[in-house]
């Protein structure tokens, strides 16, 4: 069978189901595909197909994730669902599944549970910008007041983590009944997708963001100058554009791009995803190095101190065998280079065990171009022992 061509006519949005174990995330994912399949906008996927998620590796960490895709009238969606709680933690922290919004599934019969809270916190820490709530298993609750109560609890919990609890859409439904083809509950799935369509904005495309390229390599061309190579992470770059070289030094250096090459051919414009070489005016070979970034002036700044949400690998994942404490000094790998940093654990946290998910403060020995949401790995002697996401810049 020929591969279907990917039609890019509708805007693309990445979403996922989050919430406590057994509250119905995977059943809901199956129900969405099944209901939309009846409208010819998806391929119906059974619960078992989604639940048997393949393992993937992201930054040396093994994560099981199921990917489904479907369309609504307005959009094309890529949807992730994870079988286990640990998979969510790893997924969100490594950015393996970057979500533009999430559907928080809460069982109306049980109300918010510990992982409900943890997934909301993670969403806040790693920058999932919007949440829509699906109160599931409403067919099992006859008491209207109880439903109101659970809804209030969920809204309060969202507000506690700085989401707009009062504005978040809450849809009351039953994923299982919808999956079984019960029309009144199928309608709730349609209602949910309308809420997702309307409430979660179309994300800004990577190309439309300000230009940034992590420097991977640097070389000189006699008579022409210095070339920095790398993959454009976001934005576009044209010949004549001003850029700043940021990181590893106290002051960013300003320069102008006098040439852009890709596969040894000259380009008018490079964009997000392209591997390029950028010729930099008036920059000597030793003024730019791997680990720095080229960026649109003023769009990103170098920092040394930040808070981060971190997942620490287990021994089985190739991580540490022993806990670590405050003042631990591993390497922090940002984009293309390692920088030593000193870890301070939050008050009341004595030590961190392999397999833990923790917030920490990090102070790097050299400044790096970072912003909220920047992902990194923690390494020790060349092996990955943790993965993190910057949650707050301190200085």
UniProtKB/Swiss-Prot annotation:
Where this protein primarily resides, as one coarse class? cytoplasm
The enzyme's E.C. designation: 3.6.5.3
Catalytic activity entry: GTP + H2O = GDP + phosphate + H(+)
The UniProt keywords, alphabetically, are: Cytoplasm, Elongation factor, GTP-binding, Hydrolase, Magnesium, Metal-binding, Nucleotide-binding, Protein biosynthesis
Which species is this UniProt entry from?
Answer: Geobacillus thermodenitrificans (strain NG80-2)
The protein here is known as Elongation factor Tu
Q: Does the keyword RNA-binding apply?
A: no
Could you give the subunit structure recorded for this chain? Monomer.
Q: Where is this region: G4?
A: 136-139
| Cysteine pairings via disulfide bonds | none
Q: Where does the record place the region G1?
A: 19-26
Q: Which residues bind GTP?
A: 19-26, 81-85, 136-139
Subcellular localization(s) per the UniProt record: Cytoplasm
Q: Which parts of the sequence are annotated with region: G5?
A: 174-176
Q: Indicate the segments forming the tr-type G domain, all copies.
A: 10-204
Question: Which GO MF terms are attached to this record?
Answer: GTP binding; GTPase activity; translation elongation factor activity
A Pfam family of this chain? GTP_EFTU_D3
Tell me which Gene3D superfamilies the record gives.
P-loop containing nucleotide triphosphate hydrolases, Translation factors
Q: Map out region (G3) in residue numbers.
A: 81-84
**Segments of this protein annotated with the region G2:** 60-64
* InterPro entries linked to this entry: EF-Tu_GTP-bd, EF-Tu_GTPase, EFTu-like_2, EFTU_2, G_TR_CS, P-loop_NTPase, Small_GTP-bd, T_Tr_GTP-bd_dom
Q: Does Nucleotide-binding count among this protein's keywords?
A: yes
